[in-house]
Amino acid sequence: MKKIVINGNRPLKGEVTISGAKNSVVALIPAAILADSPVTLDGVPDIQDVHSLIEILEIMGAKITFENNTLIIDPTEVVSVPMPKGKINSLRASYYFMGSLLGRFGEGVVGLPGGCYLGPRPIDLHIKGFEALGAHVTNEHGAMYLRTDEAGLQGTRIFMDMVSIGATINVMLAAVKAKGKTIIENAAREPEIIDIATLLNNMGAKVRGAGTDVIRIEGVEELHGCRHSIIPDRIEAGTYLAMAAAMGEGIKVRNVIYEHLESFIAKLQEMGVKMTIEEDMIEVHPSHDLKMTTVKTYPYPGFATDLQQPLTPLLLKAQGTGEIIDTIYAQRNKHIPELVRMGADASVEGNMIILNGPNQLHGAEVVASDLRAGACLVTAGLMAEGTTTIYNVEYILRGYDHIIEKLTALGADIQMLETEEQEGPFEVDQ
């Protein structure tokens, strides 16, 4: 077990470069097994989720090379084997193997996914999509068994009962080699969907409409390898923009796509954060006398649920009373008791978070309950007077590439240490 120790209230200055998108790469890697020759992914973040997926691929027989953020996957000798439950339990995005195994083999066994606990995240939509394509899906002893009959997967029209990025991607992976045409209606529109579609099309798939709410797929018989560059991580970018606004004395955030962050940047500007926006760089200038605002999360292009927690510490620096309402994951509020421990005037009322500011945070021992809560606590630690110790940092390492090194380069006093036996709070009530 590791912990992060931050000596806070120190100004940050310099440049930080954003890594490839975690929410893309966790689907791009399973998608690679659909090809009949090697797939090269550039800009792959060096995060724990990537290493877990690599281990799963190697168990399946893939040959892997991962150096300097370039991942080469040779799926030529991949076989359909039951997914190792330990890796699946620690990785929610492993459910993308359901779609890619169905697409390649017409069958698969995948343990029920884990990852961050954010309340119920049912995979009913995924199963409904697979069944519409002609698959038979059963839950046996905590694993999903996926099968097809001799006719294989058949293209069809699928209406998503609710907007789901995971279900949209999974159905895309299964449908690209199905017979005939598949139409996904009420599809998710996230940039990561476009990234997945770009990879699939480079492999020889015929996917149209990604980025809109109707995706059309014409099935093909085979897919080949290709080279693909992953889009920048808009959630990591938003996290560093919030840190820069909170503690920066001039920070340039490089390798960003402004259009992917419009709703987030609009909130920063509403608060009074001063920025210069260029083609692939955003510079955050020292900003004072921030104004409180209300945040309500929605599917893309609305305000991303993954960014409400990283923004919370900055909101606590602003004057006034504000609210955060997460319409995607109503239980995404486990960071609030930890911020209160640091002196925040914040509370949870139903599905709403109430914030009163400004607050001067103070160092404390806190625990990360999930990936984005961990990022929130890192930002809070940077803002706080005194020393903050964050436990359960394995969550943070799942999704932030070299966060210690990046923050150290900006002038933060931050380090990651091994925890002593019996040290620190390691669990959060869920």
Curated annotation (Swiss-Prot):
Biological or metabolic pathway of the protein: Cell wall biogenesis; peptidoglycan biosynthesis
UniProt-listed Enzyme Commission number(s): 2.5.1.7
Keyword rRNA-binding: no
Keywords, comma-separated and alphabetical: Cell cycle, Cell division, Cell shape, Cell wall biogenesis/degradation, Cytoplasm, Peptidoglycan synthesis, Pyruvate, Transferase
Keyword Signal in annotation: no
Signal peptide as annotated in the record: none
Any GO molecular function: UDP-N-acetylglucosamine 1-carboxyvinyltransferase activity
Gene Ontology CC: cytoplasm
Active site, UniProt feature: C116 (proton donor)
Residue numbers of 2-(S-cysteinyl)pyruvic acid O-phosphothioketal PTMs: C116
Positions that bind phosphoenolpyruvate: K22, N23
UniProt record, GO biological process: cell division; cell wall organization; peptidoglycan biosynthetic process; regulation of cell shape; UDP-N-acetylgalactosamine biosynthetic process
Task of the protein: Cell wall formation. Adds enolpyruvyl to UDP-N-acetylglucosamine.
Matches recorded under PANTHER family: UDP-N-ACETYLGLUCOSAMINE 1-CARBOXYVINYLTRANSFERASE, UDP-N-ACETYLGLUCOSAMINE 1-CARBOXYVINYLTRANSFERASE 2
Name used for this protein in its record: UDP-N-acetylglucosamine 1-carboxyvinyltransferase 1
